[in-house]
UniProtKB/Swiss-Prot annotation:
This is Endonuclease CUE2. It comes from Saccharomyces cerevisiae (strain ATCC 204508 / S288c) (Baker's yeast). One of its GO terms (cellular component) is cytosolic ribosome. Residues 347-443 form the Smr domain. Residues 8-51, 55-98 form the CUE domain. The CUE domains specifically bind RPS7/eS7 polyubiquitinated by MOT2/NOT4 and HEL2.
Amino acid sequence: MSMDNNDDHESKLSILMDMFPAISKSKLQVHLLENNNDLDLTIGLLLKENDDKSTVDNELHQLYDMFPQLDCSVIKDQFVINEKSVESTISDLLNYETLQKLKDNQANSPDSVKRNEKKNNWESTNDHIESIIKFTDAPKNIAQEYLAENGFDTVKAIIKIILDYYDKRDFKKDVDTFKVKRSPNTTVRGGRVQSSTGLAHVLKKGKESANVAQESLKRPRSYKHSLDSPQMVELNELVADNRDLKAINHEFLQKCLQFYDGDVVKVLNISSLLIEDDKNITKTWNFDEGFTLTSRDNCKQHLPKFSTPQISRRNEVGNTYKLPLHDKETPEGAVPVINNLFQTYRLDFHGFLPSEAVSTLKLALNKWWSKEVAERELNSHNINSYGSKVQFVSPLIVVTGRGIHSIGGISKVRLQVKSFLEKNHYIFWEESSYFRIEGKKKK
């Protein structure tokens, strides 16, 4: 290289060093020589390389923000494996996060580990997800999200989906599951705005895809729920005749009927799942609604398992679908109802004779009000300072129904229950098929 050429090379190298101070002199020199000492070409290539690196860094930082619970090295490795495709990386990381939660859950549950020793973790997770989809028709991402959030308890995830969506017209779109902490068009670390290949672009694409598939996420909503609807009447008749169904919270069954758009068969299918799963007979579910789903107190003996027959038409349910029948007599007494009182705060007198209903009501109210008084004594020297309505226990719901045998169209059970409440100075308000008892007046 001549003296003049050397001076020219050094001059161009000096310009590059001023423009790219983060790159070492030796690397800049290599770039310049590789491009035949063409300064403009070298600058253009270095700018593109720097821009690509900044874009990758920005996308990685956003992935770090989206999955703060995952190690950065895991995210970076997955990003490289997916050839720096943000969309593919998000999908894989969601699955990775689910698997990690499953492993954590199994680590805390030795029995669960033993049950799954012969089964691949991924297969086990997919089985759970498929079961949730079968009973809810939820999109896969919703099923996956609820499974992880509910400790990989399939039945609990199904129940929570029903409670969250029974009155909604559609499932939330896939894009909602990407918990991005900043809006797509904001400036990210390093002060750069994202390129068309960045995360915002991917999320926009995901939103467009969700809009295209929106019709498939819509849930059928032709059924208008009321206590007098033919479907509700039919379900009540099935419940009244069967102790297994009585073990399931009636309010939850109503929500199931709404979730399944009035399809009684599907309500019976989910009821079958609850009764078949032994652990759910003894488990108390306390979600935001605050009621108990199932309780062994309502089923004095271990319930047998059964399978649900396939029925093609809903209106055949009453004639062809029968759950295992323990007896069609009135309940065995007040004990199961009383034992479960402070879990459900509900008395259901379907199938009770008027005298049995009043006798059970008397025992329940004595226990209910005694607990309120005891709590008042523990919390204050003046128990009367709290007034006449309950402060420490929940109001009591007493379901009487409309009644097959009635006087002037009013249930005999209802008439006697109301008479008892009035005579004993209870504070209540009434609806067409139940009473809500809120306290007790001084005599």
